[in-house]
Amino acid sequence: MGQFPSRPAASFGFAEVLYAKSEFVATITIQRPQNYNAYSTRALEELATAFRDASFDDAVGVIVLTGAGHQAFCTGGDVKEYAEDYVTTPRDYWKYMALFRAYIESILNTGKPVIARLNGMAVGGGNESQLACDLTVMAQHAFIKQVGTHVGSVACGGSTQWLPITVGDKRAREILFLNEPIPAAKALDWGLVNWVVPSVRRGDEWIEKADAQEIRQAQRGENGYRIDLSRLDKEVAKLAKKLLASFPECARYTKQQVNFWKDLAWHQTVRHAQDWLALHYTSWEPVEGMRAFVEKRPARFELLRERAAAGGSSETQWGPPTRVCGACGVDLAPVATPQGTPA
């Protein structure tokens, strides 16, 4: 059996990832549909473990990454977890980013083709996940979107590195600055994905080019419209079969060679990103951005600009901790209290 015997997928006992192997194909599914398949800290560890196992298993030739259900492929990190945990302990966000790096690098370093099966929206780190994959098949009702600058973060876990070499500089900037949804047809036209497959039906009829209204009705199950992923599954299975019709060592080295520019951009920047984000999580931007997202309200972007323009601090909520509190005498208090009066 050698030093790396094949293990049954079920033996790992994952809680937030569904792992399966069949006919030389490993399927890794983010199993958090109630959270739009946002990955938690635990999910990142399970994803990296699954990819490492699939990489080492000679009974696996192709890997498929997807999400549960039809609403989301992956929506990046769990913003509720961010808001509750990481904005209060930014040092732990550095550790979290180490887990995220391990997950993304486990995709890059599998030595085997990885197919992203976009069963729904790919947002934030979800887009970074599909960018890390080798090929992407996208359901027509899905969309791609970045959110970083609108939630107090920066999409430097793959998007800032790989979008310029995937869609070009100007389009990358459009995606990253504006954070607007990119529908499937545009994603295909821009080269973000390889194939788009119809996924909207009305009764027995497939809608070959569903418009935005038809997609909304299908997602809500209105007027006879519904989402059907059967053609997506057939396309992914057909692609996996094509990929298996090649020599494994040649496929592995082809991936290594083609990864050159992705590896270069990634390794030159991601450790800086990890450290900067950990430091940034001590500031007011992620606190406001993440809480606004969780509370489903607009973030107060203009407040920071107004403070900075008035000569105040835009980095901390109540000003830098440089004053002695007039009420209690405590040192290193913020410049202002929540009511805006000097401390």
What is the predicted function of each stretch?
Residues 33, 137-142, 193-271, 279, ...:
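C-terminal long alpha-helix characteristic of the crotonase
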Residues 67-105, 122, 150-152:
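Glycine- (often His-adjacent) and acidic-residue-rich active-site loop
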Residues 22, 57, 76, 110-111, ...:
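Acidic-histidine catalytic/liganding microenvironments
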Residues 28, 65, 78, 129-131, ...:
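Hydrophobic/aromatic residues within transmembrane alpha-helices
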Residues 1-66, 230, 314-338:
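Conserved CoA-thioester-binding segment of acyl-CoA-metabolizing enzymes
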Residues 105-248:
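Crotonase-fold acyl-CoA enzyme core
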